[in-house]
Amino acid sequence: MTAIKELKAVARARGGKGAARAERRAGRVPAVIYGEKQEPVTISLGHKEITRIIYAGHFLTTLFEIDVDGVKHRVIPRDYQLDPVKDLPLHVDFLRVSQGASVTVEVPVHFENQDKAPGLKSGGTLNVVAHAVALECPAEAIPDHVVADLTGLEIGDSLHLSKVKLPAGVSSAVTGDDTLATIVAPSGLKEAEADEAAAAAAAAAKA
């Protein structure tokens, strides 16, 4: 069961860029709650608190119960904007989530057992194609990460999402089988193989 974190906010009477700038000058972060066929609710959050939560990690895969002046909203963050210079939050979007609903989230991929991949042990390099994957999950059971097992992979092999064991009730949110990583040959081996291929082509042309 995913832990639901509590967050306090106050309602904003006005939306728009001017009102948002005023909130930031007052040391707060403007935000909005939307979805579930209800009217959007414009809110503001404590700057220090939301900054700490964002930088603690897993922000976009965490369920929150936001108390807006005594009214509670069950939500998941959908997006946030950071100041391009200061890297401090400027705005946050929250999506309402009903009990039992499923959500699509980006979940980090952790690559394990590199020491058990012959291709890496022989000098190959792990080329990570996807650091995260889009998954359809029950809102109450969002995984912190998924594990990609590199055991047995040789140079030239690829690891796909279909080889990853997903938790119960969790599935890929995209069509097709995402490539997560490949084992690529070291540069010296690539050059040697290219030379061999060129020599073979030249010999075939003379034959």
Swiss-Prot record:
Provide an example Pfam family for this protein. Answer: Ribosomal_L25p
Q: Which UniProt keywords apply?
A: Ribonucleoprotein, Ribosomal protein, RNA-binding, rRNA-binding
Q: Identify the CDD domains for this entry.
A: Ribosomal_L25_TL5_CTC
Q: Name one GO biological process term.
A: translation
Q: Which GO terms describe its cellular component?
A: cytosolic large ribosomal subunit
Tell me which domain of life the UniProt entry assigns to the organism this sequence originates from: Bacteria
User: Which cysteine residues pair off into disulfide bonds?
Assistant: none
Q: Does the keyword rRNA-binding apply?
A: yes
MF GO annotations: 5S rRNA binding; structural constituent of ribosome
Q: Does the keyword RNA-binding apply?
A: yes
What protein family is recorded? Answer: Belongs to the bacterial ribosomal protein bL25 family. CTC subfamily.
* Subunit architecture: Part of the 50S ribosomal subunit; part of the 5S rRNA/L5/L18/L25 subcomplex. Contacts the 5S rRNA. Binds to the 5S rRNA independently of L5 and L18.
Task: Report the function annotation for this chain.
Answer: This is one of the proteins that binds to the 5S RNA in the ribosome where it forms part of the central protuberance.
Q: Cross-referenced PANTHER family, in alphabetical order?
A: RIBOSOMAL PROTEIN L25/GLN-TRNA SYNTHETASE, ANTI-CODON-BINDING DOMAIN-CONTAINING PROTEIN, RIBOSOMAL PROTEIN L25_GLN-TRNA SYNTHETASE, ANTI-CODON-BINDING DOMAIN-CONTAINING PROTEIN
This protein is called: Large ribosomal subunit protein bL25
